[in-house]
């Protein structure tokens, strides 16, 4: 998570 999404690694 970096953008606010649960799978945005």
From Swiss-Prot:
Signal keyword on record: no
MF annotations from Gene Ontology: toxin activity
UniProt-annotated location(s): Secreted
TM regions (residue ranges): none
Any one Gene Ontology cellular component term annotated for this protein: extracellular region
Highest taxon of source: Eukaryota
Keywords linked to the UniProt accession: Secreted, Toxin
Tissue: Expressed by the venom gland.
Predominant subcellular localization, coarse grouping: secreted
The keyword Transferase is assigned to this record: no
Protein name: Toxin To40
Species this protein is from: Tityus obscurus
Lineage, broadest ranks: Eukaryota, Metazoa, Ecdysozoa, Arthropoda, Chelicerata
């Amino acid at each position: 998570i970096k953008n606010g999404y649960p799978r945005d690694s």
